[in-house]
């Protein structure tokens, strides 16, 4: 999915839960991509593939549990991790899929991975989530 779809979906869902934490959720929703970008330029991940180590579900779920367990002091961390989890789910809806763990190169898809990046279905999903959340 494109960054705007990740942003719309995470911001909308976080607005229903904790509106004040929307910036953390948006930062988390875009984190797999900007962490990968930073890693390719400044860390020893120069040969990292897209949707690799920064895109695995297990790491984001562990971070979410840590953020949730320490509440109320760590709710921003939970929102950040929620954004990362939502990023994974959105990417898993696409044809390319996303990895469950950092040690596996297998990419999982949800519902057959039918979405194409930037396509009409992706935009419809992002707008649909946003409108449903706005209605709540």
Q: How should each PLM-predicted stretch be described?
A:
Residues 1-136:
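N-terminal membrane-targeting hydrophobic helices
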């Amino acid at each position: 999915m494109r960054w705007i779809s990740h942003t719309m979906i995470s911001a909308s869902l976080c607005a229903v839960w904790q509106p004040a934490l929307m910036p953390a959720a948006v930062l988390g929703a875009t984190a797999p991509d900007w962490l990968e970008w930073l890693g390719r330029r400044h860390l020893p991940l120069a040969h990292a593939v897209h949707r690799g180590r920064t895109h695995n579900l297990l790491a984001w779920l562990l971070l979410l549990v840590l953020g949730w367990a320490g509440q109320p002091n760590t709710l921003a961390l939970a929102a950040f991790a929620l954004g990362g989890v939502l990023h994974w789910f959105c990417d898993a809806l696409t044809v390319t899929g996303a990895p469950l763990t950092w040690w596996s190169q297998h990419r999982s898809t949800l519902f057959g991975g039918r979405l194409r990046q930037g396509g009409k279905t992706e935009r419809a999903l992002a707008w649909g989530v946003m409108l449903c959340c706005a209605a709540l």
